[in-house]
Swiss-Prot record:
Modification sites for Phosphothreonine: 199
Source organism, top-level taxon: Bacteria
Composition-biased stretches (Low complexity): 602-620
Protein name, entry field: Chaperone protein DnaK
Family that this chain belongs to: Belongs to the heat shock protein 70 family.
Gene responsible for this protein: dnaK
Species for this entry: Enterobacter sp. (strain 638)
Inducing stimuli: By stress conditions e.g. heat shock.
Length: 640
């Protein structure tokens, strides 16, 4: 059985890990980094860049450099959070035909799973380069508070990237696995506070050890899938823009290039203020007006940053209270607090968490790598490499159906351990009703319309009967990935209808297959592009070396040969500007044939140089020998 890799598909950064024996290993990417920016860029010449190369060119290509795509995955365009992002993102968020949030890249509509697949492909390639073999299976992490549509969209991204997603695992649970697996922790209850680039989760997890087997049981989870480091960056960006406007009277929001530079500077300043009390945001030539170029130089203190984001940090505290309440625990029952996600490096976040739990968070868990390590451990559990580990996760939100009067009736309550199955019998609302619509919902509100619509389906062929008489059994079945399967059965006629919940949004099978084919075609075109570049480099080298040899040959090269070589050189030079690999190879071959006489001359010159060098060495050695005097010696016997 091949390796199942663990991938933390993050909003800001992603990370990949594998099991190496009984320990998890985080893998370095092609740039030598252990984490990869979740940034994808589509360049003018049709190339797709992922990670650091994409980040480096963002300033010159802001509209086609996509970041924080995870905030859009599985979401509707009309969602309030999407509308907020649409107003501030340099790239164009649009509504797809099915109502989902998609992105317009150079006039082409692209789905978030399709874009996220590019990051997953890089993670896959990183693992393949390390292992030296193809990788086809993965465990991918998602925020614990992701709903069904977001989980399904993440699985779709994996498929488009050529990965069979063996399991979707919640990020805080993965971090708990990373923390608890290699430590003799005994029985403990821990809180995992996960504040990443775009999402926030809190999970209360119980670790039990019985006869060498460790059980990780999630007692409760809560969160906010639109709260993270990107929001902290936005506050800093808005502050800098407002300060610059006050000072210079120019609003930088209308300048995508300036805003991209500002985004990078704001993120850098935020990070610096985790270790320093103040920093300078210094951006020369940020813009210009009739009076000339304008420079930005603004001093930002840690206190200022904290005042800008205090409400964001406070927003993370309410879910902590709810999670503890749902778990039936108090703060004193928590033995360890683990911080996950880059934004938890901010001293203010650490202080607030310590104040809430009444204890300092642990510092021995790497906030950037713990989640990928946990995903790799789960992969090891699935392959049998990791034994004696049992993971019991929960569904983050209640699941139910709409019943008479527009009410949501829950069949599975939030924080129920998964996988799970639950059935309930419902009836008709009208006399002789022959069909019912099963409207599936996810959320905690009583009014059906206030919850997340996961989709609907019809059960037809119900036997005519007075209202309230037919018995329709609705069964909800949640798998280990937290994805819902629903069936409805008329107990009288035996008619049954089943669906795996694919939200009314989401990608259909045909769209996924199309994107898989496109991804495979891209892989082929990437390979061809790489081969073309290699051939071009060989051609360039041949041009340079041939010209040098013509120069060195001088008058020894007959005029006819020289003319033929010049013609072949010119033809190769023209061919190198094109995209035809076969033509470049043909022109290189023609140049090689035209240069046969030149090669002979070059070889003769080389042989003469060698002979000359050897002669010089010999005469030098002879001269040295003339200076040598044979020593006369006689044996001196020791006197005894």
């Amino acid at each position: 059985m091949g390796k199942i890799i663990g991938i933390d598909l993050g909003t800001t950064n992603s990370c990949v890990a594998i099991m190496d024996g009984t320990t998890a290993r985080v893998l370095e990417n092609a740039e030598g980094d252990r984490t990869t920016p979740s940034i994808i860029a589509y360049t003018q010449d049709g190339e797709t860049l992922v990670g650091q190369p994409a980040k480096r060119q963002a300033v010159t290509n802001p509209q086609n450099t996509l970041f924080a795509i995870k905030r859009l995955i599985g979401r509707r365009f009309q969602d309030e959070e999407v509308q907020r992002d649409e107003a501030i993102m340099p790239y164009k968020i649009i509504g797809a035909d099915n109502g989902d949030a998609w992105i317009d890249v150079k006039g082409q509509k692209m789905a978030p799973p399709q874009i996220s697949a590019e990051v997953l492909k890089k993670m896959k390639k990183t693992a393949e380069d390390y292992l030296g073999e193809p990788v086809t299976e993965a465990v991918i992490t998602v925020p614990a508070y992701f709903n069904d549509a977001q989980r399904q969209a993440t699985k779709d991204a994996g498929r488009i990237a050529g990965l069979e997603v063996k399991r979707i695992i919640n990020e805080p649970t993965a971090a708990a696995l990373a923390y608890g697996l290699d430590k003799e922790v005994g029985n403990r209850t821990i809180a995992v506070y996960d504040l990443g680039g775009g999402t926030f989760d809190i999970s209360i997890i119980e670790i039990d050890e019985v006869d060498g087997e460790k059980t990780f049981e999630v007692l409760a989870t809560n969160g906010d899938t639109h709260l993270g480091g990107e929001d902290f960056d936005s506050r800093m960006i808005n502050y800098l823009v407002d300060e610059f406007k006050k000072d210079q009277g120019i609003d930088l929001r209308n300048d995508p290039l300036a805003m991209q530079r500002l985004k990078e500077a704001a993120e850098k300043a935020k990070i610096e203020l985790s270790s320093a009390q103040q920093t300078d945001v210094n951006l020369p030539y940020i813009t210009a007006d009739a009076s000339g170029p304008k420079h930005m130089n603004i001093k930002v203190t840690r206190a200022k940053l904290e005042s800008l984001v205090e409400d964001l940090v406070n927003r993370s505290i309410e879910p902590l209270k709810v999670a503890l309440q749902d778990a039936g625990l108090s703060v004193s029952d928590i033995q360890d607090v683990i911080l996950v996600g880059g934004q938890t490096r901010m001293p203010m976040v650490q202080k607030k968490v310590a104040e809430f739990f009444g204890k300092e968070p642990r510092k021995d868990v790497n906030p950037d790598e713990a989640v990928a390590i946990g995903a790799a451990v789960q992969g090891g559990v699935l392959t049998g490499e990791v034994k004696d580990v049992l993971l019991l996760d929960v569904t983050p939100l209640s699941l139910g159906i709409e019943t008479m009067g527009g009410v949501m009736t829950a069949l599975i309550s939030k924080n129920t351990t998964i996988p799970t199955k639950h059935s309930q019998v419902f009836s008709t609302a009208e006399d002789n009703q022959s069909a019912v619509t099963i409207h599936v919902l996810q959320g905690e509100r009583k009014r059906a319309a206030d919850n997340k619509d996961l989709g609907q389906f019809n059960l037809d062929g119900i036997s005519p009967a007075p209202r309230g008489m037919p018995q329709i059994e609705v069964t909800f079945d949640i798998d280990a990935d937290g994805i819902l399967h629903v069936s409805a059965k008329d107990k009288n006629s035996g008619k049954e209808q089943k669906i795996t919940i694919k939200a009314s949004s989401g990608l259909n099978e045909e769209e996924i297959q199309k994107m898989v084919r496109e991804a495979e075609a891209n892989a082929e075109s990437d390979r061809k592009f790489e081969e073309l570049v290699q051939t071009r480099n060989q051609g360039d080298h041949l041009l340079h070396s041939t010209r040098k040899q013509v120069e060195e040959a001088g008058d020894q090269l007959p005029a006819d040969d020289k003319t033929a070589i010049e013609t072949a050189l010119s033809a190769l030079e023209t061919s190198l500007k094109g995209e035809d690999k076969a033509d470049i190879e043909a022109k290189m071959q023609e140049l090689a044939q035209a240069s046969q006489k030149l090669m002979e001359i070059a070889q003769q010159q080389h042989a003469q140089q060698q002979a000359g060098a050897a002669g010089a060495d010999a005469s030098q050695n002879h001269a040295k020998d003339d200076d040598v005097v044979d020593a006369e010696f006689e044996e001196v016997k020791d006197k005894k």
